[in-house]
């Protein structure tokens, strides 16, 4: 199944770390969409992929009707919780590092640079701006980070005899099967978009700030996931992916985090609109018509300002890199 969020096509490809290309005119995209076209014509791809709402998509996943999907894990986690609550662990998902080209490594675990496109502001009407800043400062403290991620000591977590911060089996089970767990308890509910440490960061006691640490993830695996670990002979499900050490760290923020000039933003919106219509036509066309549909899409993208958008995005990237040097 394809998540309807593919309507938001604003993704760019970076070649040789200096050149930016609009994704749907970049190398490799034609092969990918030709594969989708083949799956559509074979009846494997959901025929409603282009018309369903996000709610439709999530409901299908939650009902165990979707064999495989292309999506970010955070977007379907709630549906997986529903599957576990219904005893349908066999219908949950394990990520696979699949790429169209075997020579290309799946970069899911690649370490990203700091995203600095968003900021924090204090309004003129704030009655106590000093207190507001102190609150933001407190959010970065161990006390606040533990509260946001773990909850209240003695209620949501405890320390064992070795000083390890733990949650009960009941809470672990609830966090995996209750879709309202975070909202009901407050645990993890306000971590994003506030300041937070990475999953492997530890506090002054040596315990992880996050409940998504390697150790906590392993403790939370269900029986189906444990069977996969055994079959793949790995310690964690992510061990089958290329590890972050296999990639160089980019010297720039993720492009989605950059603030774009209004004119460039409008150009990208126009390209997105052309892409959404044209990609649907490519995917649902008879196989013999795919090449012609793809060529038509590429010409329409050029007419919509593709080359200018690529140049301006490349200039933004190079400016970002130069500021960090």
Regions found by a protein language model. Give the residues of each.
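Short helix-initiation/N-cap motifs at beta->coil->alpha
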Residues: 50-59
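Conserved small-residue motifs centered on glycine
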Residues: 146-284
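Single conserved hydrophobic/aromatic residue that forms the stacking wall/gate
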Residues: 1-10, 14
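A bilobed periplasmic-binding-protein/Venus flytrap-type ligand-binding module shared by bacterial periplasmic
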Residues: 115-128
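Short, solvent-exposed loop/beta-turn-alpha elements that line the ligand-binding surface or hinge
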Residues: 15-27, 101-110, 159-183, 314-325
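Ligand-binding "clamshell"
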Residues: 79-107
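Alpha-to-beta junction loops
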Residues: 62-74
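Glycine-centered hinge/linker elements that transmit conformational signals in sensory
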Residues: 18-47, 97-101
